[in-house]
């Protein structure tokens, strides 16, 4: 079932992505690079390691201007090779 985010959100709005991926140094840079392409800005992502240290979660908040931007970022963040999940 696909959630109708456009019915739940009023644009522009703050929107936080939580990206979980392998604990590799390039994860944060790759996430920020993708976000910059669709929502240019000055970002300070929060990074938290998993309990065993195999994965990192990267939380990054954008100012979303429309639903297409939100959906495109979900797709492109999920396409990063070392990313395992995007919430």
Swiss-Prot record:
GO terms for cellular component: cytosol. Coiled coil: none annotated. NCBIfam families: PRK04998.1. Belongs to the UPF0250 family. This is UPF0250 protein Spro_1197. Pfam families: DUF493. Gene3D superfamilies: 3.30.70.260. SUPFAM superfamilies: YbeD/HP0495-like. Signal peptide: none annotated.
């Amino acid at each position: 079932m696909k959630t109708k985010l456009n019915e739940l959100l009023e644009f522009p709005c703050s929107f936080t992505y939580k990206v979980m991926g392998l604990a590799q140094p390039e994860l944060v840079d790759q996430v920020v690079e993708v976000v910059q392409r669709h929502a240019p800005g000055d970002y300070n992502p929060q990074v938290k390691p998993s309990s065993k240290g195999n994965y990192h979660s990267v939380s990054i908040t954008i100012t979303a201007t429309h639903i297409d931007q939100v959906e495109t970022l979900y797709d492109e963040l999920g396409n990063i090779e070392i990313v395992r999940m995007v919430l």
